């Protein structure tokens, strides 16, 4: 007796919540929500706008540092090797390259947003 009542109640409640979730967003129409927006650029504008070289350099810098971090991720598993001194030397070299690259970008004002 309780099983049919529980099933009916849960199905009714589910259908009610799905109906409310379907109809409620249609009552509030936001113009910003339906306007196209691509990475801070207006996609409906001209395709020949000059591209900011600053965005490109920051993206390349991010990719390089991300690649170096990806090379450092397996180091905890590499610490189980027999040649621990070589693993620590390679890790130190990778971290030194990462720090030198960061210092170079900082000194060249590559991380500055305001010109």
Curated annotation (Swiss-Prot):
Statement: the UniProt record of this protein carries the keyword NAD? yes
Q: Which GO molecular function, any one, fits this protein according to its record? A: NADH dehydrogenase (ubiquinone) activity
Question: Which reaction(s) does its UniProt entry say it catalyses?
Answer: a ubiquinone + NADH + 5 H(+)(in) = a ubiquinol + NAD(+) + 4 H(+)(out)
Location of the protein in the cell? Mitochondrion inner membrane
- Membrane topology listed for this record: Multi-pass membrane protein
Q: Where are the membrane-spanning stretches?
A: 3-23, 55-75, 86-106
Known PANTHER family for this protein? NADH-UBIQUINONE OXIDOREDUCTASE CHAIN 3
- Full protein name: NADH-ubiquinone oxidoreductase chain 3
Lineage of the species this protein comes from: Eukaryota, Metazoa, Chordata, Craniata, Vertebrata
């Amino acid at each position: 007796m309780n099983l049919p009542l529980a099933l009916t109640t849960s199905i009714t409640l589910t259908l009610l919540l799905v109906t409310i979730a379907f109809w409620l967003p249609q009552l509030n129409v936001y113009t910003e929500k339906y306007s196209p927006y691509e990475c801070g650029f207006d996609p409906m504008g001209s395709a020949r706008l000059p591209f900011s070289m600053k965005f490109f350099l920051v993206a390349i810098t991010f990719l390089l540092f991300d690649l170096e971090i990806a090379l450092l991720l397996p180091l905890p598993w590499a610490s189980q090797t027999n040649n621990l001194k070589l693993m620590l030397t390679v890790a130190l070299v990778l971290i030194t390259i990462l720090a030198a690259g960061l210092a170079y970008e900082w000194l060249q004002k590559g991380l500055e947003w305001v010109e």
